[in-house]
Swiss-Prot record:
The keyword Transcription does not apply. Belongs to the universal ribosomal protein uS4 family. This is Small ribosomal subunit protein uS4. CDD domains: S4. GO terms for biological process: ribosomal small subunit biogenesis; translation. One of the primary rRNA binding proteins, it binds directly to 16S rRNA where it nucleates assembly of the body of the 30S subunit. With S5 and S12 plays an important role in translational accuracy. InterPro entries: Ribosomal_uS4, Ribosomal_uS4_bac-type, Ribosomal_uS4_CS, Ribosomal_uS4_N, S4_RNA-bd, S4_RNA-bd_sf. It comes from the Bacteria. The lineage of its organism: Bacteria, Bacillati, Actinomycetota, Actinomycetes, Propionibacteriales.
Amino acid sequence: MARYTGPMTKKSRRLGVDLVGGDSAYERRPYPPGQHGRGRIKESEYLLQLREKQKARFTYGVLEKQFHNYYTEASRRAGKTGDNLLQLLECRLDNVVYRAGFARTRRHARQLVTHGHFKVNGKKVDIPSFQVTAHDVIDVREKSLEMTPFIVARETHGERVVPAWLEAIPSRMRVLVHQLPVRAQIDIPVQEQLIVEYYSKK
């Protein structure tokens, strides 16, 4: 599936948020790219809405058409559209692998999923956008357990913070999905209501 593969630090600086997670280059220069990191001009309501959409889209690594599809699905569900949207994004398999501490970044997690290293409820899944649900069990496939990324993940897992809606068992390279995440458990710095306003005007 198509995805953005360009420089993420520049995107992070432009949007004012670390899109990678632990991006030291962004931490050194957390201001917009350009000469001397000049200050932002006053942004219109539309630009503020667009920026929030782009933050979410690039954080989860999805292209515009797919992101719009997530919004459409979120708007059909009961509850707040913004909360539903973030829940759909959080429940992508690649994001769950990242959140569980089994990959360095979401981009790395996407690669591991695409290469077929994971099973969901005992069945191989190689689609990064696969939606996990409550009570799903995600395992690294047995033949992949001794690959370097997973050895490193086991050895360094104590450094990662796993959200409460998931349980990671690094000794078995297993993730248990206890529940679907609620907004308070999703720690990305995005104002989802601005995303809803952006699409509601389309």
